[in-house]
Amino acid sequence: MGAGHDHGHAHGAAAAGTATSAYRGRLRMALAITLGIVVVQIVGGVLADSLALVADSAHMATDALGLGMALLAIHFANRPPSERATFGYARAEILAALANCLLLLGAGGYVVYESVQRFITPAQTEGRLALLFGVIGLVANLVSLSLLMRGQKESLNVRGAFLEVAADALGSVTVIVSSVVIMLTGWQPADPIASLVIALMIAPRTWKLLRETLSVLLEAAPKGVDMAEVRSHILATDGVEDVHDLHAWTITSGMPVLSAHVVVSPEALSAIGHEKMLHELQGCLGDHFDVEHCTFQLEPSGHAEHEARLCH
């Protein structure tokens, strides 16, 4: 006998789109700003012969693509469930976050390669021009960061975009510093060194986002949900004899789900009934854990052995 229910929260495709779609307008503004700065920095990099500027513009170009994918993911995440896609397309934002990680890694590799080439074949960078375009890039990135600051706490998709823009802002600072060094001392290696620093700044943020994204795709238990504690709370419910096939995973940002087979004594089922038992389990988990949707299968004693025989 089985029963599924939720905690009274929104769930399914609507909930999946909520965390990210609330920031759709801000993502669009950040995308427009980023595309504009890509063009400006490419022009500046060519005029100033600055690898740091060119590398930063290449990084920002991947960011623009990432922001575009984030917006596309929102579109798919808000599509309703179907017979085949029973959770809707909520996980589109997780795939977008993964793609952003790969783009960031590619951008970092490109910057490292070009920096090494610049050490082998030095070039004369125009410090003043590089400084001007570096400042323009920094101001634009700070505006984009302010647009995405709040959303990055609620959505992996938005967080991916936020981290990319943050890396760009740090990259702009690095360009500014290297430009000042070249202006004051004429030391040209400052430009490729700045490029390597940009690559190093990309790596740790990308790794953190990649781990979180893979955790969702591998259906690991949601962060903050202790499965041992969940089991203990279920077992503490009056009439519950055992719990098995306990699983918790995350569909997308802000949508953790849980399922369990709960063995209940015949006396408890007779005394309180299935509906009340489900409400007690609901209250048990709803009061202690942040789970968007729960599915419980209530079973009599010995049913687990019956399931095992059916599976072999």
Predicted region positions:
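Alpha-helical transmembrane segments and adjacent TM-loop junctions that form the membrane-embedded core
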Residues: G2-G25, M29, A52, A58, ...
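First transmembrane helix
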Residues: R28-V43, A140
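Hydrophobic alpha-helical transmembrane bundles that constitute the permease/transmembrane domains
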Residues: L35, V39, A64, A169-V173
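Short, hydrophobic transmembrane alpha-helix segments
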Residues: I42-V54
